[in-house]
Amino acid sequence: MAKLLKLTPTSNDSYVELKNIDNEYLNFPVHVFPKVIRDVINGLEKTSNFPAGATSASLLFLVSTIIGNKRKVFLKDTWIDGCSLWFAVVGKRGTMKTHAVDYMLRPINTKEIQFAENYEAEVRVFEAYTDEQKKEYFNETGNYEPVRKQMLVKNSTREGLEWLMYQNKTGIGMYKDELFGLFEETKNYSAKGVMEFYLDIFNGKIIIVNRRQAKPFTVENPFMSVLGSIQPEKMMIIASQYTDNGVVDRFLYVPTTDETPKFTLDDIPDVYKDSYTFFIDKMFHKFNNAKPAELTFSTESKQVVLARMGAFEDYKNSDDTSEAMSNYISKIITYFIRFTIIFNEMNDRGMVIQPESVDEAFHLCAYFIATGERTFAGFEAQSGLETICQRANAKTKSEMIKAIIKKIPNINTKTLMQFTGATKGLISQIKKV
């Protein structure tokens, strides 16, 4: 049984030990959020069957996108980071994950409509300017023409993302309903360059763009949070083709239930709609015109960070931790510090990271370690099934099913369906023989 970080009740513990996984850690820790958000997420799950993991990940994605480059955190001279977050919501079709994400992104979609209307109005005014007025416009804004403000992008090429980040200095959020397409981008045309591009964005490295028929430009502080959904069968493909891809272990995995909820006519109560809209509007107004600034850690918070880092390191270096999970923990540590920005800002705790923000970040990391264990264990299982089929020279669906059942008689039908792509009927037929 895999291990998990044991959560301690106070912030002053000098050591955090490891313990066995408990199912509670595979439920999204909604308790880390401010009460207004807890009530919204729990209410949406109860009234609309929206998975708490999907709504929570969507909220975190949205908050990180709103904050963007306006906040970084200073831990030490060699560790200054922002709050970009990459989420993969894993679930079958029809499990409400897409509906949950779409609902939580409504506020930003409303903003995008406003941005588009404002841009069109600015263009109409600009086009009526004289040459002298256009010069004055440049002197005042630094732009040769109006720039469309944008926070959310759904479909874009690498070139498009570079230009969007250049125009929108605060950063952007990318939502992909089918996240598998992003992994495909890192495999196809100019794959190496695309993969390095995404890794540079994740790490906030400067991007210098030089193209033959365009003026060069530089994105000094690239920022992009990512949210997408992916089906379990696509995860199987990722396990077989992308485990050496540096992009895979940058994602935080959010599993949702395989059960398809019963349809009801229950609507989302206005209290949840109003509370959520008010919270997001408040965050947006706070950061829309805010100047970039660095948060710092209080003396007490630094001690809590030190204790939690010790727990991560013990887990990472344990003989029971797989190589894949050991590598993944390094990324979790990165997210640990990024989460402190999110929680400090959501709770209006000022410009100094408070111990409560560190503990909330740690609780969230415990969840993602648990889901990471499950995800990477699935990758390892996938590799094992491939080895069985290769050794048996099994190529057709029937041959693969027979080879696997011979080696693993008790393997469940669901796993066989996901791995081979066979129907439940074919598998049952072969099992009876």
Q: Predicted segment positions?
A:
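Phosphate-handling catalytic cores of nucleic-acid transaction enzymes
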Residues: A2-V433
